[in-house]
């Protein structure tokens, strides 16, 4: 009865929206929830997972910030969710689906932000050039394999959260680091069986809801990163490009407001999620300016050295232990690794570099540093 009421409410959505009754389904079949839609159920599974919980202790941009008000990875995710749901509600899209994709889009991010991602990718490539670390792919791996789901049914063990295809696709297709991209469309020709072959930064999402999250991912961080840089005394408001101020405003709130209104005006009742050329180019210019003034600053370079040393050091010693696994070895390093391997249920033929990559990617900043210090007796 209650589920029927929820599904009836979905009929009020735009014809362009994704409807949960039309989902391409889960990898393993399940009985539907008596109250929630499939997408709402997915959002709850992500929200209550330990992997999501750890995002509050992972870097967005500024590592080991002294201020309590510097943005963390979890805050960024919640900002993306809030902005995306507002847009989705106005466009008549499925808010439950948007909510789930937004909550899960960074759940597999490495510690130390994008620096950690680059270093971890470099480490694994030195061992196995065929492997790589990209946070959007790893986020899919987290929800498909590494997340622990509490269930009395053995069939769901080692199968992650068993999310719907639309949510999984939105997660793996969310990467919005193509700065020239401000027009997105839903690719309904995608083959669900090829989700693990999604091309980095090239494939469009399957739903308009995922397109919203992908574009908002950029909208949510550029202005907030400027705020954090000002709080860290890295830049001043006067350093913001005057042309950007005229087009988008001076504060994070003004920038978000300008971009959200523009996106809604240009996307309403269309098969696209897009910004006007003027706002899209202003967003691109702001990202490029942030790259120069913030992300490549000497302050962040110092952060990067710490992150690089920690991840490279962890990978080196953990890989050697994973490659020569000895359950009789009682060292702290070996026992930590064995505990992780047993917890995740890896098969005996699992590549040691994959195990170590999974292990490090799941660490918070503080845990990675503490483990590094413990292993090297610092």
Q: Model features per residue range: what roles?
A:
Residues 98-103, 214:
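Short alpha-helical catalytic segment bearing the HExxH-like zincin motif
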Residues 85-97:
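Short pre-active-site segment immediately N-terminal to the catalytic Zn-binding motif
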Residues 94-99, 206-208:
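Short hydrophobic "helix-edge" motifs at membrane interfaces and signal-peptide entry regions
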Residues 1-77, 81-87, 116, 132, ...:
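Histidine-centered, transition-metal-coordinating active-site segments
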Residues 104-112, 220:
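Short active-site segment of divalent metal-dependent hydrolases/proteases
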Residues 113-126:
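A glycine- and small-aliphatic-rich helix-loop capping segment at beta-alpha/alpha-beta transitions
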Residues 103-107, 124, 146:
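Acidic, glycine-rich active-site loops and adjacent beta-strand->loop/helix elements
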């Amino acid at each position: 009865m209650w589920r029927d009421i929820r599904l009836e409410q979905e009929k009020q959505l735009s014809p362009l929206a994704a409807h949960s009754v039309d989902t391409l389904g889960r990898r393993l079949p399940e009985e539907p929830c008596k109250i929630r839609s499939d997408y709402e159920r997915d959002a709850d599974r992500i929200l209550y997972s330990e992997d999501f919980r750890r995002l509050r202790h992972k870097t967005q941009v500024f590592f080991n910030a002294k201020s309590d008000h510097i943005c963390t990875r979890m805050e960024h995710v919640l900002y993306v969710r809030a902005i995306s749901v507002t847009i989705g509600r106005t466009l008549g899209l499925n808010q439950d689906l948007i909510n789930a994709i937004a909550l899960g889009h960074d759940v597999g991010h490495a510690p130390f932000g994008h620096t950690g991602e680059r270093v971890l990718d470099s480490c694994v490539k030195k061992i196995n050039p065929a492997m790589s670390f990209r946070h959007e792919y790893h986020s899919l791996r987290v929800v498909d394999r590494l997340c622990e789901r509490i269930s009395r049914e053995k069939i769901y063990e080692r199968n992650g959260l068993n999310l719907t295809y639309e949510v999984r696709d939105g997660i793996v297709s969310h990467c919005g680091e193509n700065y020239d991209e401000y027009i997105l469309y839903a690719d309904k020709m995608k083959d669900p069986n090829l989700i693990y072959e999604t091309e980095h930064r090239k494939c469009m999402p399957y739903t308009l809801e995922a397109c919203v999250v992908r574009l908002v991912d950029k909208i949510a961080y550029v202005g907030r990163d400027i705020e954090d840089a000002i709080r860290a005394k890295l830049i001043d408001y006067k350093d913001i490009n005057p042309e950007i101020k005229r087009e988008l405003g001076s504060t994070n709130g003004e920038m978000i407001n300008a971009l959200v209104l523009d996106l809604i005006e240009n996307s309403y009742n269309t098969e696209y999620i897009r910004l006007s050329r003027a706002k899209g180019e202003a967003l691109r210019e702001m990202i490029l300016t942030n790259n120069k003034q913030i992300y490549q600053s000497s302050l962040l370079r110092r952060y990067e050295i710490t992150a690089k040393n920690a991840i490279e050091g962890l990978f080196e010693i953990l890989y050697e232990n994973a490659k020569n696994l000895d359950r009789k070895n009682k060292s702290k390093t070996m026992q930590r690794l064995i505990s992780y391997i047993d917890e995740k249920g890896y098969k005996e033929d699992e590549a040691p570099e994959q195990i170590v990559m999974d292990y490090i990617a799941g660490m918070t900043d503080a845990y990675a540093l503490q483990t590094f210090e413990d292993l090297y007796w610092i």
